[in-house]
Amino acid sequence: MAQILGSPDGLSVMLLVLAVGAVFVVVIRARPVLGVVGCLAALCLVPPWVGAGFGVFVTPLLAACLGSIVALWHGSDMRLRAFDAALVLVLGAVAVGFVAGIVTLERAFAAVIGWGVAYLAGRIIGMRVSPGDVATVVAVAFGVVATLAILEFFTRNNVFVDIKLGGNGYARWSGIRWRGGVPRAEGAWGSAIALGGALAMSVPFVWVSRLRSAAKALVLTAVAFAAVVTFSRIGMISTILALVGCLVLLGSAVTPAFRRVVAALLVVGAAIAVPLTSDVFTAAGDEASNSADYRGDLLSLVPEMSWLGGTGSMTTNAAGETRYGSFGSIDSAPILLGLDYGVLPLLVLVGASLAAFVAVLRTRRNAALVAVVAVIPGLTSVAFITQFTTMFWLCVGLAVADADRSARAYAPQVSWTGPPVRPLARAGADRPALLG
């Protein structure tokens, strides 16, 4: 930061960024739905390695979420919900762990900023923008994402890897992964798994969006096919769960004819996808089974978790590479959370996840809640990576905001059965002024 402010060019860039941010806030304050557009554009079309260093690495997505929070906070009229308290408890424990020196700065930043900002943005946007508008913006955005992923599969060209602006994340996330001799679609997400999970989460929003039925069916088909060409089992299974969840839990949002069409498309799509994916996984040989075995082996790290703070088995070498015992990476969000922050924060979030499953079955359902529940099982096999982290916590915030809205809309109205109450008189209006 000192280097940026110490040079004329750096100071000019900083002033330009602040000016753009101020305009962004003013525009969103006037048209709140543009906050959703800005966040979704940065989420879906900007690779995770693009950003600038201002003491910390700031991505356009983080900036868009922060700008939306600043612009829309006033008037959001949020009330504390149970999950608000749970997340504050978790992030507070992380902050205490950092102050105590048992949580690293990198991990504390990832939780407090990476999760907290996305959640708060979703929470506030959900209070200021109608669910229908949010769902329609998400549907259009992921229609574009799905189209780009399908084009990437057929052309074998990812246009985003040519964007080299930003920090050191390019080397980590820009490489295209292959499975069975076939490149996996990644889009701007830096990972096929992240793209697959995000596509699955978009399904309920497309389902309840204000798009016409034909356009809605087309986008759902594109999203499902795009999930297939990620060749990510997590993405494909989560997408199926999301579609089934929509059919069962959000059926009232569409016509019976549309439900029948989607059910038929689901059967036809499965008939097409199974041979395609089986050929790829067969060609991959032991790669897929080894990947599954590796995730099973991660359970051996559970006894290494501390009650609060990072595990003692975590080491970081001179190159900044972190290892947990003999494992170089942890592809399981619950296990990584327990290793980085401790068992207590993990138990709180596991309890919140179970509450989400109960809520989606017993309370008024919404698209964001169905989206979150659809991917929770997959979190056991994927960590919070790239924009998938923001997508997940943004949806959690939207789900809680919808619950907040519903609690007010459906609150019982208690009628007054006593004698009529005369309103207080206003001087000079309801009573004559005193004569002197």
Please tell me what each predicted stretch does.
Residues 20-25, 67-77, 94-149, 352, ...:
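Transmembrane alpha-helical segments and their membrane-water interfaces
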Residues 21-22, 136-160, 172-230, 238-248:
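Alpha-helical transmembrane segments of multi-pass inner-membrane proteins
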Residues 33-51, 60-116, 373-378, 431, ...:
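N-terminal hydrophobic segments of proteins, predominantly signal-anchor/transmembrane helices
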Residues 35-42, 359-383, 388:
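Loop-to-helix entry and N-terminal half of a specific, functionally important transmembrane alpha helix
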Residues 67, 371-376, 385-436:
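Transmembrane alpha-helices of multi-pass inner-membrane enzymes
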Residues 147-157, 247-287, 303-305, 435:
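A membrane-periplasm/extracellular boundary helix in multi-pass inner-membrane enzymes
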Residues 244, 248, 259, 340-376:
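Hydrophobic transmembrane alpha-helices and their immediate junctions
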Residues 278-341, 356:
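Long extracytoplasmic/lumenal interhelical loops at the membrane interface
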